[in-house]
């Protein structure tokens, strides 16, 4: 009797486990579909949708650059996502302005050098919160000692980290000779990209930024000012 009961419990469990194994074996990289629509909604809800004069939050880019729930776009021939939003969200770039280790280091520097605290914060936020930093300086809203951690705490664009617009608005002006986050930000809402002849209709209407091919976006000099 006991053996029969155990068999009755074990058999369905074996079937479930086998089904899961076979499903995984058949398609270890499931396409984005079904429940992943919820993931897309989460991405759209969590990312910054703030709009500034020179920058726009990554949440305004997600409509076109997030995973396709039907698995038809932004996946390769094997169903792997090639969504820049998914790749970016897991990086230090996306979390640069919220990284607790960085915030602790900045706080420590301020404690050691209290007379220079705000100036130090201004230097650090140039690379860790470039959208907030440059938006404040370019619009003249930065304080006398620059863009501080207090400014960052209430700034959605700054907390978006090294967001989409932070890199895609960098003009090709002496990039290899720059340092300390001295980024030449385009003043005309141009979004430089690595693909030639982009269609600008949807993107300019959705975000206000015009996609333009920029050869420099394929070169490491774009990263040089901070790295």
Regions found by a protein language model. Give the residues of each.
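Sequence context of c-type cytochrome heme-c attachment sites
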Residues: 23-160, 169-218, 225
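Ca2+-coordinating acidic residues in Ca2+-binding motifs
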Residues: 166
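Intrinsic low-complexity, intrinsically disordered segments enriched in polar/basic residues
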Residues: 6-9, 93
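Structural signature of FAD isoalloxazine-binding scaffolds in flavoprotein oxidoreductases
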Residues: 163
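Positively charged n-region of N-terminal signal peptides that target proteins for export
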Residues: 1-5
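Bacterial N-terminal signal peptides
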Residues: 9-19
